[in-house]
Amino acid sequence: MKRQSERDSSPSGRGSSSSAKRPREREREAEAGGRRAAHKASGGAKHPVPARARDKPRGSGSGGGGHRDGRGTGDANHRASSGRSSGSGAGGGGRGGKASGDPGASGMSPRASPLPPPPPPPGAEPACPGSSAAAPEYKTLLISSLSPALPAEHLEDRLFHQFKRFGEISLRLSHTPELGRVAYVNFRHPQDAREARQHALARQLLLYDRPLKVEPVYLRGGGGSSRRSSSSSAAASTPPPGPPAPADPLGYLPLHGGYQYKQRSLSPVAAPPLREPRARHAAAAFALDAAAAAAVGLSRERALDYYGLYDDRGRPYGYPAVCEEDLMPEDDQRATRNLFIGNLDHSVSEVELRRAFEKYGIIEEVVIKRPARGQGGAYAFLKFQNLDMAHRAKVAMSGRVIGRNPIKIGYGKANPTTRLWVGGLGPNTSLAALAREFDRFGSIRTIDHVKGDSFAYIQYESLDAAQAACAKMRGFPLGGPDRRLRVDFAKAEETRYPQQYQPSPLPVHYELLTDGYTRHRNLDADLVRDRTPPHLLYSDRDRTFLEGDWTSPSKSSDRRNSLEGYSRSVRSRSGERWGADGDRGLPKPWEERRKRRSLSSDRGRTTHSPYEERSRTKGSGQQSERGSDRTPERSRKENHSSEGTKESSSNSLSNSRHGAEERGHHHHHHEAADSSHGKKARDSERNHRTTEAEPKPLEEPKHETKKLKNLSEYAQTLQLGWNGLLVLKNSCFPTSMHILEGDQGVISSLLKDHTSGSKLTQLKIAQRLRLDQPKLDEVTRRIKQGSPNGYAVLLATQATPSGLGTEGMPTVEPGLQRRLLRNLVSYLKQKQAAGVISLPVGGSKGRDGTGMLYAFPPCDFSQQYLQSALRTLGKLEEEHMVIVIVRDTA
């Protein structure tokens, strides 16, 4: 009855009832109305908030029962305050006040939020919600709209090459229910991530004609659960509601609905009705700002826990996340280049581990331990070349499934040496700065650093000094406030080719930051991941994306120091190293190979050179004499023997003619070329000249091919360079080496005992060189530097007791097992490496008279020196090696 009488009362009575309220209650009502208005503007929960019992009699209006629905039930106080300012208690006025913000309408100072900031210009970075300072930082980019049909490795390589130009990155693939296949690109510095995103906004990225979507993943400002920033972007899937948590200062869109990310709830149902004390005004302000951001198209910006990405993304769906913070190498004192890989299958092989991890860096050693059944799973230790490679592999592969189990990765124990690897250097770091900071721990022997590189090698005289420097200098700021050093131990016996600190040339450096080997031929452009080639934005319709020329670290260092004025192609796997060597006084074998390449490069073209036309016009009878193995392609290749060595396999008619024209030994070749004789006359003339050029009883290549049945017989036709034992660990391999090209004096001067001066009979392989293109280029550069009398190339075959030149074969020392050479070749093939021996054995007192020996198994690099044998025998089935001996230049 009391409520009915109040409903029938006059407007004056309603006004007097409202004016009789206490000031404290009016303030509470205005505060609640502002909170509801902000929550509705941000797309928040529309849950009914029950009015206080003592306020019900005062909430009268002329709207009748229509204002007692779900919307009007929680707005009694709001309508009361609105009625005081407007002079009427209409429900429509109450709703209008709710939409426009009641604190201002009631004459009170607004306590919810200032007006939203103006929208940023197109392409600019969005401002942090609720902050007037700089934009929020992010180090991770989310790449979506990826094709589900592309192989994972191929997709990773393409994305890696696109984004690595902006800085040091790590990349992982994942799959989400909402976006499908996605990729996360992590940058070390926020400015690198921002630059990459701005580049993606300016130029549309395509992957096989499919536009990619690039979005930032913001660093988290605080923990908690999330809500939508606008009601218009509600998700289709809603996860189970989580426990209530404090409101986060950022209002943003979460990324994945069904994943176990440490994110806030997708649905407003799970959020409390904004009744947390003291923090509600800030939450409302941030909600308003988030709504304004959504109005200008920023609702797709995401904010996830940054470290949660390292643990969760790319993990198989359904595996629990490991809540573990991944420290950077400069902050983690336990970080080393050795990784422990746990929870492996007992059947896992070294090949599987290398295939999974080698994309992140050079793996020097793999050790797999398989405990007995019932005593735990298998585990392994992987030794990378440096700390950056190990950390990149640890971050990227943690939780990945190898075999049937998700693996666990941690750092192994360090192997202290006197040599340190120092990473994280700035582009302006100098040798003087490195020496000044590191010499306080002890005497420094060498510093290997190229200005502009991000790493250096420092060798101490004592192990204690190296250990002290490694412990104290990790995390030391050098080169700027945003750069801190990453220090770890490196192989003490390896040395880079010196650039400034040491004047004399040293053996080829083994510390190139390479990633990708000859085993994966389609990943040749992925050789150097820490050194970014200046690729343009790739187009996936361009099939040469992975075949483009760029400069590797070894080549860039050579160019910076002006050691040689030449350029090389990183894709070259044979003698394709220099474009204009004729004016440098190189020996004729190099010129011949260069000219042979220029001829062979015309294969498959519609236009043919006169040389090819002459080859096609030869008679059918002559073609039958050559046999089926003498193809036109082989006939166009040239014999690349040295000037003083006449090889019996150069009886190919076209090759003899072309080789004679290059050397200029027979002037009547030009007369025969200009003669008007017919085809038969020219063929007979060439046969006659071939016989004159090679004073051997064999007149037809067919007879010679039948005589030389294998590579050992072919080697007997060459000059013997050395015979003895190659030693690897506890095995020795009797070997005979015959000279393919080069100087005999290099062999006699370097392959001798330094103490007694006698000829060496045993060579021990102590190091390995990975068959990576930058390292092969470095070997070729050293060969070029040693020309014409500073190198030798030999063919190594199995030495037989009855073979020619094996009468001086030494006896096997006790403790060594005699094995066939094919076992050594198989070992090097499996390791994808070449054997390395420092010459002379035992060291040298001075800098003169030193060199290196490289023992290459059959590979693309070694095949360039066996073209003559390949033409003669057709195919090389016998196991062999190509030995390259290079003398160091002063």
From Swiss-Prot:
Q: Which SMART domains does the annotation name?
A: RRM
Judging by the UniProt lineage, the source's domain of life is Eukaryota
Bias class Gly residues marks the residues at 86-99
* Gene Ontology MF: a single term: RNA binding
Q: Where is this region: Interaction with Epstein-Barr virus BMLF1?
A: 722-890
Residues modified to Phosphothreonine: T532
User: Chief localization class?
Assistant: nucleus
The record ties this protein, via Gene3D superfamilies, to: 2.40.290.10, 3.30.70.330
What is the similarity comment for this entry? Belongs to the RRM Spen family.
This protein's name: Putative RNA-binding protein 15B
Q: Which organism is it from?
A: Homo sapiens (Human)
Tell me the name of the encoding gene. RBM15B
